[in-house]
Amino acid sequence: METSTQRTGSHLAQTAAARHSASSRGEAARVSSRDELAEMAAASQGNFEGKFESLDLAELAKKQPWWRTLFGQESGPSAEKYSVATQLLIGGVTGWCTGFIFQKVGKLAATAVGGGFFLLQLANHTGYIKVDWQRVEKDMKKAKEQLKIRKSNQIPTEVKSKAEEVVSFVKKNVLVTGGFFGGFLLGMAS
């Protein structure tokens, strides 16, 4: 005698097997609920017949600089892929946007710093704030000594490698870089 639990279990196994065979024939299997998805996952445990290779995305990202995804897999100059006008347009538009944003943020930052300095001077002259200049001088001397101790003439290897990548990109893509700097200056002026 078969119980309802056994019937349900065998029904689930038949459903999963039917779906697995349908998907293996190339037909699209539709999953209508989470329960069916869980059933399919449970039924397919250990039924993989091929060897799968894992892909380490962190290692791949280290080997693929961002400009390769933007300009293509070739690391060669973009002059081989795009016309002169296209390169100048790409560089000019991105440079203009960057310059415009830099100008707006720079104005806001300069206003905040200048306004804060103005308010501090006003508060100092009206007597709300008293500055202990001897203590400021003593703290500045301490900071100078600490900077002299930590001073190193060597550039870290990470910074050096990134700088080399940037220089290489600039050399290979002169038109895009020139367009960017021209657009940046236009964006700063507008």
Curated annotation (Swiss-Prot):
The keyword RNA-binding does not apply. Keywords: Membrane, Mitochondrion, Mitochondrion outer membrane, Nucleus, Phosphoprotein, Transcription, Transcription regulation, Transmembrane, Transmembrane helix. The chain crosses the membrane at residues 82-102, 109-129, 166-186. Residues 103-108, 187-190 are mitochondrial intermembrane. GO terms for cellular component: mitochondrial outer membrane; nucleus. It is a multi-pass membrane protein. Residues 1-13 have a biased composition (Polar residues). Residues 1-81, 130-165 are cytoplasmic. Pfam families: FUN14 (PF04930). It comes from the Eukaryota. Its main location: mitochondrion. One of its GO terms (biological process) is regulation of platelet activation. PANTHER family: FUN14 DOMAIN CONTAINING, FUN14 DOMAIN-CONTAINING PROTEIN 2. This is FUN14 domain-containing protein 2.
